[in-house]
């Protein structure tokens, strides 16, 4: 029953009406799972369960996704001890990461999977595997032989990059990371 939209709010996630409030306030801090070394989660029965709070979370001001802009000491990333693998040059298929229903709604991308598949087919003839957090095959297993990972805004794209799989995003804050038109010639 929040009504004072002039106040700054802090929210964890976008469910339970919090996104409706985000749209109305002038100033907010958004908290969600981090891009790296996330807390343990499990995905089942169309729900995400947080198993522990030992990992990192992200806090973003007036957006759902951090732009990456700013100057940050490199020791912050080094302290995460992320083993970044060399780029996989022999992957055979593209993982198309289906957004959750709430993200499709928030970003007004109800046909994102089909529209993105059609766009990809203009630039590649590789097999496209649609994956979401409730898929039977784990993302870790799929990434072993993936050529690329394509997502609207999933933090799984950062995991893919760390595992040597180039990631492509269509969300405006992340689109500058890679260009889908260059999917056959990744950076």
Give the location of each predicted region.
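A nucleotide-sugar donor-handling region in carbohydrate enzymes
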Residues: 31-93, 97-106
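Conserved catalytic-core segment of nucleotide-activated headgroup transferases in glycan assembly
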Residues: 87-134
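Active-site and donor-binding regions of nucleotide-sugar-utilizing enzymes
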Residues: 1-59, 99, 137-140, 156-157
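C-terminal amphipathic helix plus adjacent low-complexity
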Residues: 8, 60-62, 84, 110, ...
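Donor nucleotide-activated moiety binding/catalytic core segment of transferases
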Residues: 2, 17, 118-121, 126-178
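Structural motif
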Residues: 7-8, 93, 147-148
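Residues at the C-termini of beta-strands that transition into short coil/loop
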Residues: 13, 32-34, 132-134, 171, ...
């Amino acid at each position: 029953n929040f009504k004072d939209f002039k106040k700054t709010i802090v929210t964890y996630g976008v469910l339970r009406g919090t996104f409706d409030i985000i749209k109305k306030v002038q100033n907010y801090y958004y908290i969600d799972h981090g891009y790296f070394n996330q807390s343990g989660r499990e995905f089942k029965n169309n729900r995400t369960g947080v198993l522990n709070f030992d990992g990192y979370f992200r806090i973003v001001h007036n957006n759902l996704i951090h732009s990456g802009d700013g100057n940050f000491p490199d020791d912050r990333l080094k302290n995460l001890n992320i083993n970044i693998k060399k780029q996989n040059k022999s992957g055979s298929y593209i993982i198309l990461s289906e957004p959750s229903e709430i993200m499709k709604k928030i970003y007004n991308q109800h046909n994102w999977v089909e529209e993105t598949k059609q766009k990809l087919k203009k630039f590649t003839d590789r097999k496209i595997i649609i994956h979401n957090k409730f898929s039977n095959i784990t993302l870790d297993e799929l990434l072993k032989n993936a050529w690329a990972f394509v997502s609207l805004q999933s933090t799984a794209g950062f995991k893919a990059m760390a595992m040597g799989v180039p990631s492509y995003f269509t969300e405006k804050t992340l689109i500058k990371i890679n260009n889908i038109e260059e999917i056959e010639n990744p950076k």
